[in-house]
Amino acid sequence: MAIRARSWRPPPPPLLLLLLWVTGQAAPVAGLGLGSDSELQIERRFVPEECPRTVRSGDFVRYHYVGTFPDGQKFDSSYDRDSTFNVFVGKGQLIAGMDQALVGMCVNERRFVKIPPKLAYGSDGVSGVIPPDSVLHFDVLLMDIWNSEDQVQIHTYFKPPSCPRTIQVSDFVRYHYNGTFLDGTLFDSSHNRMKTYDTYVGIGWLIPGMDKGLLGMCVGEKRIITIPPFLAYGEDGDGKDIPGQASLVFDVALLDLHNPKDGISIENKVVPENCERRSQSGDFLRYHYNGTLLDGTFFDSSYSRNRTFDTYIGQGYVIPGIDEGLLGVCIGEKRRIVVPPHLGYGEEGRGNIPGSAVLVFDIHVIDFHNPSDSISITSHYKPPDCSVLSKKGDYLKYHYNASLLDGTLLDSTWNLGKTYNIVLGFGQVVLGMDMGLREMCVGEKRTVIIPPHLGYGEAGVDGEVPGSAVLVFDIELLELVAGLPEGYMFVWNGEVSANLFEEIDKDGDGEVLLEEFSEYIHAQVASGKGKLAPGFDAEMIVKNMFTNQDRNGDGKVTAEEFKLKDQETKHDEL
């Protein structure tokens, strides 16, 4: 049920001295003392173990009773009306014997009371109901006590060690509760609905006692709030489950707290000493996170998926609170971002995130880049003689360690015990590496940082390189073999023989077969007269050269077909 405020009226004026109904129901009575039928007698048939409060003169009580004569004949019962008897004690609103008998009772205590005529209805009796000079017996069960001077009572039975913030007026809260009467009878529970009660505090959305009882609570705190009826639903009750003049007891556990004026809060957990760059709007981030509610309830984690969350920031791809909270982070930084619901998933929530929930994200930034980034090169060592620099077409042998920006090692040629060998500028490595190996001399050591759009992109390499990852390569160039001029796969180191075809055609039949051609080219390379492009399959180069000369494709080259490159620009051979 909703704990909403109702219009409140002060306690009613005193009841009549003799509480009689036209229906013939007499006011319940009880007494205090022992002795004969001429004295008030009380038998305490049940006393609860805990009795924090007893009835005093001036208190207002709610109790059930059964009234009988000594022979057992019933003359009245509150149970028959399915309603407690509600009255002030010690103010003359009851017969004297009952006024005395109720004093000292505990809630849930049961008393059997014998009231002599002089403390009941005396020699007059009640016409048609109670004969003159009747001894009256009452079986009384006390349900409720309060006093018009009572205030809200608060008992905190659990308080978390850390309490950075407490409920203030105008805060919005989410809490669970069990609502009972003073006798322990449950009338409502948010737990049964499996949904928190969500409301503003101190602006009249709640009954006055709850508005007051919630103030000062911490998230995670548990407290008992006891509310007298004039700060709850008053003399009329709520018209459904709560009777009039009922004291209410709420066992409250606070789960969440925020104010509509709140922004995000950021707590830096780990900030690297070296932070050369901080994230800005438009950057693309890869980060891990654990997501919890304010009370610690887990709702999501990138770690459980074994994959970072990858997104642009500052462009509306994530909730506003995270968009803001990820600005200004360093690579490797860990921070806690607390996001109020109006900067999170709002009143509706999403999935297992309830509506109006404050969210807590523990973030670990793995890397970030900007789509406009190029590679970054830092040279750590250059030999004294660093005049021959790598260029397109050169054949390179180098060692490297490949890692992510957070230091996670991906690959290492040193661990494999062999160099990595490529021809520069022929797409044998990712574009960023190709760029990073340019203008490098043998013996040089450098670090190349490659953004994903110049590396392995959004897809990455399954099981090896995460998607959208910035890569860091520590490189040492060990060997450089100069390449050939662009467009050539073979060049002569000296003058070309005027009788080149005849030299290749050793058998003099006027036709050169692939075997003859291959043997001749390899002989020229071996003698230093010619040079094949380094880093490529020599046989494939020779075969391509032969194919280019074999213009009719009959598997042999004639003198008519044979041309040098400078004689036939359409072909790359020789």
Curated annotation (Swiss-Prot):
Catalysis: reaction(s): [protein]-peptidylproline (omega=180) = [protein]-peptidylproline (omega=0)
Pfam assignment, any one: FKBP_C
Broad class of enzyme this protein falls into: isomerase
S-S bonds: none
Record-annotated EF-hand domain positions: 492-527, 537-572
Glycosylation sites: 178, 290, 306, 401
Record comment: activity regulation: Inhibited by FK506.
Domain PPIase FKBP-type: 58-146, 170-258, 282-369, 393-481
Location relative to the cell: Endoplasmic reticulum
GO cellular component: endoplasmic reticulum
EC number(s) stated in the UniProt entry for this protein: 5.2.1.8
The record's account of how the chain is modified after translation: Phosphorylated.
Keyword line: Calcium, Endoplasmic reticulum, Glycoprotein, Isomerase, Metal-binding, Repeat, Rotamase, Signal
Function noted in UniProt: PPIases accelerate the folding of proteins during protein synthesis.
Protein name stated in the entry: Peptidyl-prolyl cis-trans isomerase FKBP9
Organism, as annotated: Bos taurus
Lineage of the species this protein comes from: Eukaryota, Metazoa, Chordata, Craniata, Vertebrata
Primary gene name: FKBP9
